[in-house]
Amino acid sequence: MKGKAGGKAADAAEKVAASNRRARFDYDIEDTWEAGLVLTGSEVKSLREGNVNLSDAYAMPRGEELWLLNCRIGEYKQAAHFGHAPLRDRKLLMNRAEIDRVRGKVEQRGYTLVPLRIYFKQGWAKVELGLARGRSHEDRRGAIAERESKREMDRALARGRRR
């Protein structure tokens, strides 16, 4: 029996297992998609513990499917005999039309698919993929300067409100 009326509030919450904050700094994210992950039991347990690293991960189409590569999901300690390989390729689940749309955009020069975060939505492991274009060193500096100026404006407004 669910605690809330209808049980929607508890199920609708997303529990973030890992986020790739560096990707938003290194790349311009132009579009995002949600995809399901095909995982083994020990991988799910390890994800729930937050034992995952997305820093070097990326996704790419192979044949008619999308795959997540270089995503390290650490071994689950209690899965002694039936553990998993931490760096194995993992299949992503999306609709055929979405996969075709993503494939068309990724095949353009300069674009890549980067996982932005892995989270649980209604008990299912999901990954948020971003269509990314690399930033140059100057672009990164511009982003830092823009962020700093926004902080300064927010601070000045906050000081003005306190008086």
Swiss-Prot record:
Span list, region Disordered: 140-163
Gene Ontology CC: cytosol
GO biological process: trans-translation
GO MF entry, a single one: RNA binding
Keyword RNA-binding recorded: yes
A Pfam family annotated for this UniProt entry: SmpB
Entries under InterPro entries matching the protein: SmpB (IPR023620), SsrA-bd_prot (IPR000037), SsrA-bd_prot_CS (IPR020081)
Keywords: Cytoplasm, RNA-binding
Ranges of compositional bias, category Basic and acidic residues: 140-157
Subcellular location: Cytoplasm
Family: Belongs to the SmpB family.
NCBIfam families from the UniProt entry: PRK05422.1, smpB
Function, as annotated: Required for rescue of stalled ribosomes mediated by trans-translation. Binds to transfer-messenger RNA (tmRNA), required for stable association of tmRNA with ribosomes. tmRNA and SmpB together mimic tRNA shape, replacing the anticodon stem-loop with SmpB. tmRNA is encoded by the ssrA gene; the 2 termini fold to resemble tRNA(Ala) and it encodes a 'tag peptide', a short internal open reading frame. During trans-translation Ala-aminoacylated tmRNA acts like a tRNA, entering the A-site of stalled ribosomes, displacing the stalled mRNA.
HAMAP family: SmpB
Protein name: SsrA-binding protein
Source species: Anaeromyxobacter dehalogenans (strain 2CP-C)
Lineage: Bacteria, Pseudomonadati, Myxococcota, Myxococcia, Myxococcales
Record gene name: smpB
